[in-house]
Structures are given as C-alpha cells and as structure tokens.
C-alpha cells in the first residue's frame, strides 16, 4: 500500500480539546459528517471529564480541500472506561461502534490475572435531534433466554424476586409514579458485593453506586 499526504482533516483550533487525538474515525451517518477521536489530557469542562475522553465532532466536510469544519463537539460516552472506539458498516448499512472498555488512566490488571480489560458490546449509531443515539446491536436479542415477566407488582420495603437471578441480564423496569422517595435495584448481590441502581424521585437524580461491586 502506498500512502500519499493530502491534508490535515481537522485539528484543535483553540487548544481546548486535549493534546493528542487518538484513534480517529471519520464517516457519514444519516447524512451528517462525524469525526470520532479520543483526545488525551482534556480538562473537565461542560460534559467532558478530566483526562482521556472519547468525543465526536459534527460539521461540514469540504470534499475538494479534504478538510472537516466541525461546528459541535460532544462526549461520546460519560464513563471513564470507554476509549478508542472504532466503527464499521454492517452488510445492511448499519453503522456499528465498538470501544475499548478500559482507559490509560485506569489501573492495569493485577499480575495474577490472565486477562486485561475487554471490548464493549457493539452499538448501533443513529442521529436523533442533532446528537448521536446509541443502542446495543439488535443481534444481542438472539442470546435472550428464560424470559421472566412481573406485572403490576407492588413493592414495599425490601423485595427479592426469586426468578430473577444471574450475572447477565437484560432488564426493563417500568415504575409507576407513586408515594415513594427512593427506589433501588441491587445487582449481583451476595454477602460481600452488590451494585446499586437508585432513582431519587424528589431530586430527579439517577445514581449507579459501584462502591461494593468488587473488582
């Protein structure tokens, strides 16, 4: 393969978008031009967190000059352990994205572990209301087994549903507005560990607490 230099597609115009832009990916999505990069050393401003991020730029592409004039920049994922995503086209035209579920700022695996981090579940990308909308690829549904359904279940205090268990779940919960202040679902719970998903009704806050999630 012989490569020829053509132009600088895009660059940080004012020095506010980190230092090196890693793993760039440029493509057209629903008639919008998108540039995905993973800039290092971003400052915590607006929707960006401190350190390494994954972001996407939206704007206009000059095909003659081969220059991308970005107009808007958004965070691609709010988690710290999502980095260097890349996309591909499925045979049916869907834009699919896979990321590295790790970050250079995260702790490297312990010496006695035989694996280090993993890749994310592939996501389908679409444009909705001027932003990228992400959903798990529809092929995930082929892995669903042993469906359990509870309807009109009234919960008071602690409640454990014996039929719902396991380390891998795809769960949909519909909560009817009622007289409650806080609603919590504890995942992967045993004597030592649990991960809590909490809805605070009064403050309209949603919290994922991984304090006791373990490694």
Language model features: what each stretch is:
Residues 13, 25, 119, 123:
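Solvent-exposed, flexible loop/coil residues
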Residues 55, 60-80, 86-215:
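Beta-rich accessory regions
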Residues 8-13, 73-76:
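Short loop/turn motifs that cap or connect beta-strands within the blades
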Residues 16-17, 45-51, 113-116:
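Short consensus segments that form the blades of beta-propeller domains
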Residues 22-25, 83-86:
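Beta-propeller and closely related beta-sheet repeat lectin domains
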Residues 1, 5-8, 23-27, 32-44, ...:
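Hydrophobic core segments of beta-strands in well-ordered, beta-rich domains
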Residues 15-21, 78-81:
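Short glycine-/Asp-/Thr-/Trp-enriched loop segments that recur within the blades
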